[in-house]
């Protein structure tokens, strides 16, 4: 029996259960929960990619998708929560739905997404108003089963990119604090998470992973995967693999 057969059986069982309680006192208490479970069965698995700044999250997202979509670089690039999912956008020129914090939505281009990355004053002013960006892709087989979430890095250090303007630094810290909480929230509510390390685990890594474990949303060793990135740049990292298992 394959996965589709099992899913169909569970879906039908939920249907039968909903029909059974339709005319009972249980209806008001359980009908919405049953419908929610059916919706989850039909939805793709949500896989969040998290990790410290410059750990290689966007490189991994591009590798999983098989195309260069997520912007990458040697400095911090992902400054927004970027979601890649199955779907047909209204136009090829503007395939990304930008959801603002005030609830406003607007279709934007890939160039607009790229303009949000980094820590310049202009980028900070734009990203400060954005909740998330959703890129719809219709011809990628992976997205039939998985919705990928590229999250902002955690543990950023202001000044790494030559930023010395106090107002910009304060804005960066405020935005980073919100994005770090967004990353924790998204990772806690995702079906699975890939966490990237590129060095011996730090307190930042440990605290973040502890927040997932204690979050009560089901991220465990079964659906949480740790990935040691950039080992080709420093093969001695492999010798320290025991540090990652503690």
Predicted features along the sequence, with ranges:
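Globular "head" domains of long coiled-coil molecular machines
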Residues: 8-15, 38-246
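Membrane-targeting and insertion segments and their boundary/processing signals
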Residues: 4, 27-30, 34, 54-58
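Charged, amphipathic alpha-helical linker segments immediately N-terminal to NTP-binding catalytic cores
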Residues: 1-25
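Long amphipathic alpha-helical scaffold segments
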Residues: 24-44
């Amino acid at each position: 029996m394959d996965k589709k057969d099992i899913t169909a059986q569970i879906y039908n069982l939920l249907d039968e259960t909903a029909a059974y309680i339709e005319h009972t006192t249980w209806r008001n208490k359980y009908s919405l929960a049953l419908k929610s479970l059916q919706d989850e069965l039909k939805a793709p698995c949500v896989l969040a990619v998290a990790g410290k700044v410059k750990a290689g999250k966007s490189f991994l997202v591009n590798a999983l998708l098989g195309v260069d979509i997520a912007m990458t670089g040697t400095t911090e690039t992902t400054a927004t929560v970027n979601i890649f999912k199955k779907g047909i956008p209204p136009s090829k020129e503007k395939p990304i739905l930008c959801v603002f914090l005030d609830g406003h939505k607007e279709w934007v281009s890939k160039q607009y997404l790229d303009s949000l990355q980094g820590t310049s004053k202009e980028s900070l002013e734009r990203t400060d108003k954005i909740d998330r960006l959703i890129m719809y892709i219709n011809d990628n087989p992976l997205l039939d089963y998985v919705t990928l979430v590229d999250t902002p890095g955690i543990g950023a250090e202001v000044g790494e990119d030559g930023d010395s303007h106090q107002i910009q630094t304060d804005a960066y810290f405020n935005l980073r604090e919100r994005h770090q909480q967004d990353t924790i929230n998204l990772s806690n509510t995702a079906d699975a998470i890939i966490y990237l390390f590129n060095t011996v685990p730090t307190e930042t890594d440990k605290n973040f992973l502890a927040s997932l474990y204690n979050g009560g949303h089901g991220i465990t060793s079964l659906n949480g995967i740790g990935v040691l990135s950039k080992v080709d740049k420093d093969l001695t990292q492999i010798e320290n693999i025991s540090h990652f298992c503690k």
